[in-house]
From Swiss-Prot:
Keywords: Chromosome, Developmental protein, Differentiation, DNA condensation, DNA-binding, Nucleosome core, Nucleus, Phosphoprotein, Spermatogenesis. GO terms for cellular component: nucleosome; nucleus. The modification Phosphoserine is found at residues 8, 10, 37. This is Protamine-2. Testis.
Length: 102
């Protein structure tokens, strides 16, 4: 998982606007980062607590698809192997049994 996250300009402007509304001084934070190279900014953000894990928000459709795949994946594998065996052998000789996961 990636430890740092580069924010877009729009997110940065919202953050600065929110700080100005709250009355926090934005000067020292902005001036320190301006004189640093991109690599140093990355290190600075990591060491000064501005880093966070990049999270991918899952949609309901994506979660549903992943959940379905977990249940059906083992059955699909067994069916595919049986189809391949039918080509070469006279029948599927594997016993029909449920997946051990369920």
């Amino acid at each position: 998982m990636v430890r740092y996250c580069v924010r877009s300009l729009s997110e940065r402007s919202h953050e600065v606007y929110g700080q100005q509304l709250r009355g926090q001084e934005q000067g020292h934070h902005g001036q320190e980062e301006q004189g640093l190279s991109p690599e140093d900014v990355e290190v600075y953000e990591r060491t000064h607590g501005h880093s966070h894990y990049r999270r991918r928000h899952c949609s309901r459709r994506r979660l549903h698809r992943i959940h379905r795949q977990q249940h059906r994946s083992c059955g699909r594998r067994r069916r595919r192997s049986c189809r391949q065996r039918r080509r070469h052998r006279r029948g599927c000789r594997t016993r029909r049994r449920r997946c051990r996961r369920h």
